[in-house]
């Protein structure tokens, strides 16, 4: 009796398998793949680990994309945003600081009041608030947000330099020969304070690269179809829970190297251009 039941079960199982094969012609292929990859988490992790060590220096993400290629492409986005936003902030801060320091009086008071409003709000909170209000992701949006909010320190330094230089003899000589105010501001005074502006430009590149990473990590930065270090860190959160740490390591290592290199470059540039150290 028992043998007859076993035979009937075997026949029914075979009929089910044959039915599955008829409905899904790839059933045999999928079954073979499941046997190769394994059904447990340890087996899948071993396969990914083997690929990471044997084929890809930094492994692959959950979609199978090369992490090294992603981190290189992400560096392009972060550097582009950092440089573009630093240029916007430097131009804005230099122009406003030049007008405030050169003209003084009510112009200086109005621009200082404008500066006080921006500087009284913590920078990161201001950036996050503006990004949340705009609700429009994109590289240009991030550049404008960072550039239009990060000009305050440049304004303060440029204003102080113009207050100091506008009363010097070479500016008075330019006034005596009939040079206009704009010419005195940007042709005679600006070349003598350009070292301050260049150093601030380099410092703000580092600041804005880190700010872009923070924005993209929180979901307020570049869109999902644009690779950046911040979006890679965002993706690596779920992977880190499963033990896939290499995307997080790649993004952080590349960012640390770039920020350290720019910081060393800024220190060297300050030493080379500062007239007090010559």
Q: For each predicted feature, which ranges?
A:
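Alpha-helical transmembrane segments of integral membrane proteins
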Residues: 60-278
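Membrane-topology segments of multi-pass transport proteins
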Residues: 1-63
